[in-house]
Structures are given as C-alpha cells and as structure tokens.
Amino acid sequence: MKSIISIAALSVLGLISKTMAAPAPAPVPGTAWNGSHDVMDFNYHESNRFEMSNWPNGEMFNCRWTPNNDKFENGKLKLTIDRDGSGYTCGEYRTKNYYGYGMFQVNMKPIKNPGVVSSFFTYTGPSDGTKWDEIDIEFLGYDTTKVQFNYYTNGQGHHEHIHYLGFDASQGFHTYGFFWARNSITWYVDGTAVYTAYDNIPDTPGKIMMNAWNGIGVDDWLRPFNGRTNISAYYDWVSYDAPRN
C-alpha cells in the first residue's frame, strides 16, 4: 500500500486564510466529549495498533520511509532522517484504525533543520479506498518558533495558516492538537485554542500519522535541505477523544 500525502507549498495568499476566526475555549473532557479517551504511548511498537511505513513516497519527499528509522527510546518514538547506500531515508508511523470527529493531540519535539518537516496529522485517500481528506500540524525545520496548520477536503487544500508560538518547539516537548467537528477545526497549543477554520471541512475518518522527512523541489516552502543526517523528531504520546454523541 502506497500513500501519497502531497502537501502544497506555501503561497503568499496561503498564509492569510479567510477561514480564521476568534478561537473557541478548549473543550473539557467529560463535557465536550463522551468520556471515550484513547492515549497511545510509545514504550514499544504495538503492532496490533500501529504500522511503520516502508516505501518511497515520491514527489516532494526526497527520502524512502523505512522501519529502521522508527525507534523507541526512553518511552518515546524517534523518527529519524538519515542516509544509506540508496539515498536518504526517513520515518513514518501510523495507526491501523481510522478516527473521525474528535480531539487529536500529540506531545512532541520537532527537528530544527532547513529543508525538513516534522508532522502530526490525520490522513485518508485513494490508497485507503476513500477520497483524500487530511488535517495537518507541520513544523518546518528552518524556523521552529512557528507551526503550520493545514487541511485537505477531497484533495482541495490551500488552507495553510502559520501560527507564531512564542517559543522554539525544537527545544522541548509541548502539546499540539486539533478539535475536528462537523463544521470546524480548531487547533491548540499547550491546551490553548489558537486558530479555527470553518470553510469546506473534511468529513472522512483518517489514520493518525506522524512523520519526519526532507524535501526536494520545494525550497520556497521548506528552504533548501543541507544534507544533514541522523536528525530526529521525538514523540512522547498521542491521544484521541471522541465527541459526545
């Protein structure tokens, strides 16, 4: 199974989304949700719940996903960008199950390096027998004092929004997330709502995914990759809370 997770390069217009609105207060478990709470930690590879990607993604991804780059150290998942005799290698980790509306969160520390992306997102597409729907949290390694939010509905993107964090995400673990509802997506940083989108919201359940990769042909977006290897993004845990019925 090959998953093509195309992420559009930023445009000037993409930085200013017409969907921005005043963020809503953070939902409180037990009131906004029905009490269904699933925490996924990374003490070891749970093969019944997760899978490691093992293929080249092509296009702007200048590396090959390999399970060798998905490691578990000190209770954390480490996704590494490296190189072998065939070229650059990178890491991607995903759930086997699909998740719909609800609160998605990750505690992570991204890579600080030009030309690379560290991410947390939901995705489903043609390789899953569905339309392409996706919701993204992406760190562009050239400047980890900001984070990019984005989403795709039936393959239609251009919803990029840059949020300035007020800290360097690569220097420590922080919690990032999004609350996906039928008519909106609200993104969070350390429990505080920072951005909401309302336009053409995706509706297809997707897999929870994380990856770290180096780009090619997207220098305007990521800045040129400098060839540095053995660099890693770290993930402490992810969680999913289902909404109240």
Swiss-Prot record:
Its main location: secreted. Optimum temperature is 45 degrees Celsius. It is an enzyme of class 3 (hydrolase). Gene3D superfamilies: 2.60.120.200. The keyword Transport does not apply. Pfam families: Glyco_hydro_16. It catalyses: Hydrolysis of (1->4)-beta-D-glucosidic linkages in beta-D-glucans containing (1->3)- and (1->4)-bonds. Optimum pH is 5.8-6.2. Keywords: Disulfide bond, Glycosidase, Hydrolase, Secreted, Signal. InterPro entries: Beta-glucanase/XTH (IPR044791), Beta_glucanase (IPR008264), ConA-like_dom_sf (IPR013320), GH16 (IPR000757). The keyword S-adenosyl-L-methionine does not apply. Disulfide bonds join C63-C90. Residues 1-29 form the signal peptide. Residues 30-245 form the GH16 domain. Its EC number is 3.2.1.73. PANTHER family: XYLOGLUCAN ENDOTRANSGLUCOSYLASE/HYDROLASE PROTEIN 8-RELATED (PTHR31062). NCBIfam families: BGlucanaseBglS (NF047856). Belongs to the glycosyl hydrolase 16 family. This is Beta-glucanase.
